[in-house]
């Protein structure tokens, strides 16, 4: 490949590298948004063991929906 075409052939990444949510290192494309397989598996483990939870307000659990039958 000629030298002048190498600069034109440079590919821009689709996403900017973001910090890993587990350790803060720059993320890698193979493990996005994590930096490594280890950080990805740590996050998955937290989801599977229930360490992450979406909070629910008390009044939301007793809300009445007109379309539902009791």
From Swiss-Prot:
Pfam families: YacG (PF03884). Zn(2+) binds at residues 20, 23, 35, 39. Its cofactor is Zn(2+). InterPro entries: DNA_gyrase_inhibitor_YacG (IPR005584), Znf_NHR/GATA (IPR013088). One of its GO terms (molecular function) is zinc ion binding. Binds 1 zinc ion. The keyword Transcription does not apply. Keywords: Metal-binding, Zinc. One of its GO terms (biological process) is regulation of DNA-templated transcription. NCBIfam families: PRK01343.1. Interacts with GyrB. Inhibits all the catalytic activities of DNA gyrase by preventing its interaction with DNA. Acts by binding directly to the C-terminal domain of GyrB, which probably disrupts DNA binding by the gyrase. HAMAP family: DNA_gyrase_inhibitor_YacG. Belongs to the DNA gyrase inhibitor YacG family. This is DNA gyrase inhibitor YacG. It comes from Rhizobium leguminosarum bv. trifolii (strain WSM2304).
